[in-house]
């Protein structure tokens, strides 16, 4: 059975559920986590996370949960600023290294844009450029819906 995110933001596993991605309020002002969705409805960051094996998914989602709690105060080794308001979630499991890129928007909201398996020392410029394109699209669609 393939593990999937359900409509509540849970990744459902045979043995347990992990839910750091749900929308809601808590006693502490937490950041809302959203996946960027392209015009065709696809969600690159969600699709990337779901493509990972269960253990790496769990590590990525734990870091997303930390981001939800800490927002822009989350720093290395969990998060790092890259360029022009684009940040990365940093996850390592064994020899595998993954990154999920994101940006902040007004209203304590984090938008996860895209992810990749890191194979070089430096984050590929193409991934940062893609995150910037997704951010521009997100903000343009947000503005046009007002």
Residue ranges and their predicted role:
Residues 1-97, 106-110, 119-146:
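Basic, Lys/Arg-enriched alpha-helical interface segments
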Residues 113:
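ATP-dependent carboxylate-activation loops
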Residues 116:
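Residue-level signal for short, function-critical loop segments
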């Amino acid at each position: 059975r393939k593990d999937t995110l359900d409509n509540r933001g849970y990744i459902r596993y045979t043995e347990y559920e992990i839910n750091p991605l749900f929308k809601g309020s808590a006693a502490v002002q937490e950041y809302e986590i959203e996946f960027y969705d392209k015009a065709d409805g696809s969600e690159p960051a969600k699709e990337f996370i779901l493509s990972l094996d269960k253990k790496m998914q769990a590590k990525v989602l734990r870091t997303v949960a930390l981001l939800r709690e800490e927002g822009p105060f989350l720093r290395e080794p969990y998060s790092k600023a890259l360029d022009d308001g684009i940040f990365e979630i940093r996850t390592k499991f064994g020899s595998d290294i993954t990154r999920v890129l994101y940006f902040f928007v007004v209203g304590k909201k984090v938008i996860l844009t895209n992810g990749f398996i890191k194979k070089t020392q430096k984050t590929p410029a193409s991934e940062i450029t893609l995150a910037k394109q997704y951010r521009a699209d997100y903000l343009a669609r947000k503005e046009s819906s007002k």
